C-alpha cells in the first residue's frame, strides 16, 4: 500500500455540508470521499427546462456569528437574498398561517374552540395534570402535554403521522425540540383573533442564494479547499476500523490516520462486519424516505407561499414548496415551480404520486393541469431520522463503538438527528477541531 499513512491524515466520508466544513477547517492533510459526481450532498440543485430545483427545500438560517460571517462575506458574498417566511397550512378548506398553533384565525369556529379549550386544559387545567406531573412516554403525549387535544387532533397527530409514516405513539417524546413552537396562552388567543404578530418558529427569516440555487453554498465552501484531496465518484463499500482502512466500491483501499464519518449512521450495518450487537443497533436506526415531485407550470395565480403544510389524508403529500416564490430566478418568466413532498417507509412507485400532485395542485387553484410544462421526481432514500423508541439507545451504542475506534461522526445523518444546514456546517467544523485537540 506504499508509505505509512501519517497519523494526522484524515479521511472524510461524505462531501455534504458537514464533510466540506470539516475539510475547510482542517485546511490540509485530508482526503474527502464523495460518492456522487459533485460535492454538496442533499444541498444540490439541478436545472431542467429553465427551472431550478433543489433536492427538496433548503433554507439557510445562520445564528452562529462565525458561520454568519463566512456566509455573508465569503461563501455567498453578493449572492444572498434575505427572505421573510411565507408559510401556510391548508386544512378544512382554509389557508391559515404557519405555525398552526399560533394562527387559528380563519378556521371553523368549532375547531378554534377545540384548540383553545384543549390548550388551556393541557397546560393549566385539571385534565392535563397527569401528563404535566409524570415523564412523557411518546410523541403523542408530548403533543397532548404541550398543545392539548384540539391541536393534536386537528393538526399535530395527522400531520406527523403523514410525515413520519408511523403513529406518534411509536415516536419518542424527544423528537420535538426547538423545531415545534410551543406558544403561550396569550399567543394562542391572539392567533385565534387574527392579531398574532407573526414570526413564530425557528425559520421565520432565512437566506437563499440569488443565483445557483442552494448548491451555491457547498460550491462556495468547496472553493476554500485549496489543499487536501477531494475524490468524486468514490463510493465507500466497507470500513475496517481495526486496520484503519476504507474500501471503495472499486476495490481500492484507502488507509487513514483519523476518520470523520458523515454518511447515514444506519449505513454502519452494511459497512462493518461486526461486532453483532453494534450491527443490530445500527439496523434499529430507522428513517423515512421522501419522494419529491417537481412541477413547472404556467403562472395562473393562486395562493402565494414559500411552502405549505397539508395534514389531511385526502392529500397524500405532507408539504408543498414553491421555489420560484422564494427566488423568481428559479423558474422561467411567466412560470411557477412546485416541489411536492411525499414520505414513505420503503420503495414506492412515483408515477401515481406525480399524477396525484398535479391533480391536487389543480384542485387547489395553484396550476392549470393543461398548462404544466414539466413533471419529474426524485427519491431521497434517507430523508428524516425516525425518532422511535429505539433511537436514543441504538444511536448512542453505534456512536460509542465508532468513537472507541477513533472515528468522529458529523452532520445530520452522521449524528442521526434532525438538524439544519447551519448545524451540519457547525458539526463538521467541530469535528475537525476535535481532531486537533
What is the meaning of each model-derived region?
Residues 13, 27-48:
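Glycine-rich FAD pyrophosphate-binding loop
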Residues 49-130:
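Dinucleotide-binding Rossmann-like beta1-alpha1 core, especially the glycine-rich loop
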Residues 389-437:
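C-terminal lid/capping helical subdomain adjacent to the catalytic/cofactor pocket in oxidative enzymes
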